[in-house]
Amino acid sequence: MAVTETILFLLLVAIGTLVQSITGFAMGLIIMGGVTALGLAEIAFSAAVVSLISMVNAVVALRHTYRYVDRIFWRNLVMGLVPFTIAGLALLHILSTGFTEGLKVLLGIVIILAGGLLMAQPHPFGHSSGRFSTIATGSAGGLVTGLYGAGGAPLAWFMYRQPLDVNVIRATLLATFLVSTAGRSAFVTVSGQLTSEIVLTALLSIPIVVVVTLMSRRIAPFVPDKLLRRFVFLLLILLGASLILRPIYR
């Protein structure tokens, strides 16, 4: 990427990291949507970078919260997530050869749906979800992670409906994101798709991810949750709509 494109990419990384650190998800969607809408890079490239920096974000955020992880939910989510992440990545490889515009439209749909989930205020279930529904949710998140490196929306919506403490929910989500992004990155590396440009862009992004994640702990108490959610919702809707409508008006 050129200098201007790299700066824009890093700006999207900073915005996405701040939102993710406060709300629990949306970093990958903001980066993927912004990069794709602005034409900064191909989907496969952006998704690979997002996976690497999301992995770092999860590691940094889990330093003080890993004790809160609900291991039963985490295990069941991962059981569905890992195989479907691989399936989504394989599907991305197939579709990238001749279905690029379709991938962008599908990304737009995913982003808009995620925006809707972000604004939804689901009432917690009366009891914890069972093993099957947890694995199914992990599978859905894994498929989107494999395709776009950003499958947090269904996982976050599902976990925030559980009758659990919010610290447990956030830590469990972060631990799940860590597995999904690490697994995706490992598969990309083994399959020979990890280029030097992907690594360089990720290395430039990682300091921003670390600094913004640490700063967000001080900023979060002063940011109204509803205001932030509305801002992110509007941003996601605009990004998603631009990706869906672009082929129509070309």
Which role does the model predict for each range below?
Residues 1-16, 21, 33-44, 60-142, ...:
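Juxtamembrane transmembrane-helix boundary motif
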Residues 17, 47-54, 173-180, 236:
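Transmembrane helix-bundle signature of multi-pass membrane transporters/permeases
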Residues 23-31, 147-156:
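Transmembrane helix boundary and interhelical junction motifs in multipass membrane proteins
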Residues 31, 60-66, 154-159, 184-194:
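Generic transmembrane alpha-helix signature in multi-pass membrane proteins
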Residues 31-42, 155-168:
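Interfacial segments of multi-pass membrane proteins
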Residues 41-50, 72-73, 163-175:
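Membrane-interface alpha-helices at helix entry/exit sites of multi-pass transporters
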Residues 168-188, 199-200:
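Hydrophobic alpha-helical transmembrane segments of multi-pass integral membrane proteins
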